[in-house]
Amino acid sequence: QNFVLMGHSRGAMLSVLIAASEPTRVKQLMLIDGLLPIPVDANHAAKQMSRYVSDFRRPHRAKKKGFQNRNEAVALRVKAANLPIRVASILAERNLKLIDGEYFWHVDDRLKAASALKLTHEHNVAFLSAVNCPIHVVVANQGMGNYDKFKEMMQSFPWIYWHKMEGHHHLHMDEQAKDIAKLCTEHWR
């Protein structure tokens, strides 16, 4: 069975790895503000694993901060993540839980943790070379990646199409959602 993958941030990176591993099944990628993991030198592998182990243990010990009301929690998310209030409010709908009279952000702390293993530049190139389908990458001009660096690196991959948009890392949850949806309908086959 063939399929299209769409991913945001780490989900975008994982989509590339899956497409490279299943090149006959994945027929298209739509990636939002993500493409590849930031490469590391191979000699940093042990240090990276150490960070992963440390980060993996930390969430289980950390006491989460409770908020008196929803607005207080949303305001902190706006400040901490530099998000518009409407996007932080959408995140709150999904991720705020009321427990014993206080609001808590309920997210998987492992999303903030270091990866167990990181890929080298050569690994990234090998994975991209194994992808056998068009890749559409929506890049937020205020997003996480270094657009110019990735665009320069990817010029040797003609099946990668860049779509730079105004917006932040979570632009797919904001006004640009319609533009991204239009892009999907234009390019998915």
Where are these regions (language model features)?
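C-terminal alpha-helix
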Residues: 183-187
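Conserved beta-strand scaffold positions in the cores of enzyme catalytic domains, especially
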Residues: 137, 162-164
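Catalytic histidine-centered segment of alpha/beta-hydrolase-like enzymes
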Residues: 165-177, 181
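Conserved hydrolase catalytic core segment
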Residues: 1-45
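Conserved serine/cysteine hydrolase catalytic core
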Residues: 98-155
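A catalytic-pocket lid/entrance helix-loop region that shapes and gates access to the active site
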Residues: 32-66
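Conserved alpha/beta-hydrolase catalytic His-Asp/Glu region
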Residues: 62-118
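Active-site loop/turn elements of alpha/beta-hydrolase fold enzymes
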Residues: 34, 142, 167
